[in-house]
Amino acid sequence: WRVDAVEEKPTVRKPVPPFTTSTLQQEANRKLRLSARETMRCAQGLYERGFITYMRTDSVHLSDQAISASRSCVESLYGKEYLSKGPRQFNTKARNAQEAHEAIRPSGESFRTPGDTGLEGRDLAVYELIWKRTVASQMAEARLTMLSVDLSSGKASFRAGGKRIDFPGFFRAYVEGSDDPDAALEGQEVLLPALAVGDAPKPKEVEPLGHQTQPPARFSEASLVKMLEKEGIGRPSTYASIIGTIVDRGYATLLGNALTPSFTAFAVTALLEEHFPDLVDTSFTARMENTLDEISHGKVQYLPYLEGFYKGDEGLETQVQQREGDIDPGASRTIDLEGLSSVVRIGRFGAYLEAKRVSDDGEEELIKATLPQEITPADLDEDQAELILKQKADGPEAIGEDPETGDLVYLLFGQYGPYVQRGQVSDENPKPKRASRPKGQKPEDLTLEDALGLLR
């Protein structure tokens, strides 16, 4: 092994702008695990009680009063060396920003520190987030040195990268995506051993690691708000309600921090894309938002626009009349998933499986089985579908016997997903022992030993 090159490159990191509505929702989701709706509820309460400025804004501008208050906080809490060289203003980059209000910040001529507010719980957490971000915007840049070392061994070349913090600057108050700036400072540094060109280091271990690209992650509320803002869809006052509507109508569910589309969402999207493509085109929605902005500014009259939207030659009423005859109700509520021999349909009470099978007497019959709510389109595979349909057609199948009680143990599918049960429901045993299957474990992989462990 030989060191071929060592490079140290100084760089700076500038603080991010104060919060807009969308960036507050994104950061509160990442740091505090709050939904957009919960964030806005907290912010509304803080605003009404005089702790922060108006919380529906797309501007990153700070008033002279806010800049002065921020710089006073920096000097008193961190020292003069942590102040930026001069007052710092930011330019709004959001498309179609209205900038009717300044950025979200603590209110008043001087900022109350989070500990002096008397706030508790989520209100305190959201206020502290706003306070830190505002104060950090007037702090000095962080100065870092990027490190790289090139090594070779025979014909193979390797590169190691690192980072050293020379002056933390605004990192002392705020690090994006981290709850604890001090702890985050340690994570910002990746130090390398002191090496010089020509050195011959001895490796302790060499391990080849494979890498595979992954599909894009599901949207979290934070990343969805960011995408809506990027595409020009929605406004500060509507981001939370857009996401709330998606969830309330059952088009998506929150699994952990991920927005997971439902079977209903697949069916509705397919119908709209086939018969009303303009309505689900992002550019159409962005243009509509622009027109609504012009209406709010008095540049466009609202009544002619609405009449054209609903009753014009290409209006919604005309489109529905022209195309509703082409819509097959049965096909529009059917979802074809790759790899399934059965089909998924959407009914009044949710998604269900449908398949044909030949009975013992040779007659063909149609089997329908409700899909548990916890199963998403991405999770449903042929094995799960077969188990659900088999249980519906033949009744529960025992996976074994409990040696202690002699009762049979069953794997069942209920409204909220697979579960195990000891014994059957009877007059003597109206409530048999049940336990949910662990998340992430496929039903077909569940053994008798697993089931007994869950039931104990």
Language-model features, listed with the residues they occupy:
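Basic, low-complexity terminal or inter-domain segments flanking catalytic cores
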Residues: 7, 11, 36-37, 58-456
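Flexible coil/turn residues that form the inter-helical turn or adjacent wing/linker of helix-turn-helix
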Residues: 17, 32, 217
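A conserved hydrophobic secondary-structure block that centers on an alpha-helix together
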Residues: 27, 31-39
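Residues within the DNA-recognition helix of helix-turn-helix
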Residues: 42
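Eukaryotic nuclear/nucleolar intrinsically disordered, charge-dense low-complexity regions
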Residues: 49-52
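Short Lys/Arg-enriched helix C-cap and helix-to-coil transition segments
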Residues: 55
